């Protein structure tokens, strides 16, 4: 009743002299709408917590039997290497695809030494977009029961750089590797999955695809493209029993991120990949994004806050993101100047 009295007083102050019955109806509608809005936010957050901390993901063996294969791109370092090792530990044979043949050979030997699985390797430079490389990849996977595809290959800017100053070769490589390379590889692999009515297509995304990222504009745009493409692909392939998932990730210690120290929000590849593979099919902190997930606990909470509480496309968030990357650029340029000075002495 106190709420109704205050509501009626507000209407009077605004010069809206409604009939008492209409005032009561209006107050009830306003109260109900507010309650439903708050309840929906609370329920969404509970769903996020359950997804991140309680509910298990789909078991990896649901995508293929023992002896089936996983294809991992960008496999020789960082996340790609860790995906390869953990999938081999789970019993999958591994096709390793990356640029450096020597690293692939070393990783293949490590995998076969530690685990009773087979490996195949392909040294392939995705930036070259060479038809012969894709034909060789097709020849390797033809006849294999490929149950899992990990689209991990990717490239970012060397340092945060305004778009107008971005070198053309860097811009071209980012789009060719992140977008075209992922699309061409996926198109080679999924026909077999569609025929077998099972499989997993997992693509590495980024918070850069959620939040417009000034000074990383080309990279951010490439990851936003993958977000839309992967979601569309997920809807197309779901009737075939294929799980498609884009992983939304914040920073991870890696050569690409240039971050070396772990923290609560920056895991190492081993912890991150373990979270990803244990939460397949769970949205984590991305309940508003179909066929997507933020499975690592701190990344999930950050994604929920950014997408459900903040406005990721708003000027405030974009401006803060810009300021952060401007500061990173200044530090990187100062470091480059110091190293240049050391070499000249």
Swiss-Prot record:
What does the record list as coiled-coil region(s)? none
* Enzyme Commission number: 1.1.1.330
- One MF term in GO for this entry? very-long-chain 3-oxoacyl-CoA reductase activity
Q: Does the keyword Lipid metabolism apply?
A: yes
Pathway per its UniProt entry is: Lipid metabolism; fatty acid biosynthesis
Where in or outside the cell is it found? Endoplasmic reticulum membrane
One GO term under biological process is: fatty acid elongation
Annotated membrane topology: Single-pass membrane protein
Alphabetically list the UniProt keywords. Endoplasmic reticulum, Fatty acid biosynthesis, Fatty acid metabolism, Lipid biosynthesis, Lipid metabolism, Membrane, NADP, Oxidoreductase, Transmembrane, Transmembrane helix
List, alphabetically, the SUPFAM superfamilies matched: NAD(P)-binding Rossmann-fold domains
Any stretches that span the bilayer, and where are they? Answer: 26-46
Q: Which CDD domains match?
A: 17beta-HSD1_like_SDR_c
Q: What enzyme category does the UniProt record give?
A: oxidoreductase
Could you give one GO CC term from the UniProt record? endoplasmic reticulum membrane
Q: What Gene3D superfamilies does the entry give?
A: NAD(P)-binding Rossmann-like Domain
Superkingdom: Eukaryota
Q: Where is the active site?
A: 219 (proton donor), 223 (lowers pka of active site tyr)
Q: Does the keyword Transmembrane helix apply?
A: yes
Extract the InterPro entries matched here: 3_ketoreductase_fungal, NAD(P)-bd_dom_sf, Sc_DH/Rdtase_CS, SDR_fam
Residues that bind NADP(+), according to the entry?
71, 125, 133, 152, 219, 223, 252, 254
Question: What's the catalysed reaction?
Answer: a very-long-chain (3R)-3-hydroxyacyl-CoA + NADP(+) = a very-long-chain 3-oxoacyl-CoA + NADPH + H(+)
Task performed by this protein: Component of the microsomal membrane bound fatty acid elongation system, which produces the 26-carbon very long-chain fatty acids (VLCFA) from palmitate. Catalyzes the reduction of the 3-ketoacyl-CoA intermediate that is formed in each cycle of fatty acid elongation. VLCFAs serve as precursors for ceramide and sphingolipids.
Membership in a protein family: Belongs to the short-chain dehydrogenases/reductases (SDR) family.
Q: What is the official name of this protein in its record?
A: Very-long-chain 3-oxoacyl-CoA reductase
What organism does the UniProt record list as the source?
Answer: Aspergillus fumigatus (strain ATCC MYA-4609 / CBS 101355 / FGSC A1100 / Af293)
